[in-house]
Structures are given as structure tokens and as C-alpha cells.
Amino acid sequence: RAIILKARQQGISTYCAGRVFWKTYFTPHARSVVMAHDSATSDALFNMSRNIIRNMDSLYKPTELRSNAKEIVISSPHFKKDATGEKPVSSYRLYTAGSPEAGRGTTPTIAHLSEIAFWQHDEKILAGLFQGISEAPGTEVILESTANGAQGEFYRLWRGALDGENEYTPIFLPWFTTSE
């Protein structure tokens, strides 16, 4: 579990999107969730995974069993057949944090939650999502955001991580670490 307080335009969201795709690609039965504060950002993060698949060499390219505006279901060439003779599948699902119920009822094994400090219903959405995420080995949660004042769930989780009061590893990436 990681919580990242970041500056803009450092490639952190791109890295996280790539990591989530990598975990989904190599983890049978992975259920990945990507959620951002607005639909344009959510779509951009989701399209990064589409571009990764599109640009993969055919030797490594996963089979897309379903692909639409909100979900990609893949079978990776790395997946081995299970006891029933079937190859497992993994999914990558897109949400936007526009409703207090966004993501509720899902059971992700991997979650990339972006710009949480700007979510309108941050407390309710995170409560619903966190109920469905197991503590089992292999699960992964990445919370990342630029700052938005000393308020809200992202701030509370960030302070808790700094104080060692929750399971998140705090990662601070200020603007001055990137030369422009």
C-alpha cells in the first residue's frame, strides 16, 4: 500500500498506470480498478493501458476477451491453464469518482486511485472501495494526488501514513525534484 503526494507533470500517474497494467498482465484473476477525480483523467489513465496493449509485440500481447469504454478483460500469454483446462483471465476496470457510490460493490485486487484530494465524495467512495479490497498478499493499492489543502480523506490518510498510524507507505515527490 502506497500513498503518494506529488507535484504535477512528473509522470507519477503514468508510472502508476503502467504498474497496474503490469500487475494485471502478470497476475491471473487480477481485478484492477482505476479511478480519478474526473472522466477526462480517468479516460486518460485507462487509455494508457490500451496503448500499452496496442504497442506490445504480438509475442507478448494478451488476448483481449472483452474491451469497451470501461473495461478490458485479458488472458495473458503468461497465464497457465488451471485444473479445469481453462486459462485464467484478469480485468482492468475504469471508474470516475463523480458519485458517492462509485466503485462500491467491486472486489479489486489492485487499485490505482488518482487525484483523491479532488474527489467530491472522497470519504464515501474510499469507504466503499476499501471494504472490497483484501489484505491478502499480492493485493496492491496506490493512492496518489497533488495537494489540495489540509482537509479531506487524502490529507487524513497522508498524515496517518507519516505518523505510522495506517498501512500506507508515504512517498513525497515535490516539484523541485524534476528539472524543467
Short names for language-model regions:
Residues 1-180:
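Phosphate/NTP-binding elements of NTP-utilizing enzymes
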